[in-house]
């Protein structure tokens, strides 16, 4: 069975076409508390480079959007305002990312 980090690496490449040179564990939490015991782990992938087209495998239909971090919140609000479905885990991941970064997009330290 692959580790959560191995899964994250594989999913990043399959779904987005990118690989990362470094990974930082952020947190693990339930995907749907009360409905399932499935847990989801979040990692910060850094040093991205495009290595493939992305878009998923088999019958997945994934569109990759490249949005500057400073514009992500407004872009997500626009998407939900248009009635598009945005996975709440995206907001959760961005929240924990924002706790690690200062306002300039650099890691606090």
Across the structure, where does each feature detected by a protein language model lie?
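Active-site segment of metal-dependent pyrophosphate-handling enzymes
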Residues: 13, 17-51, 78
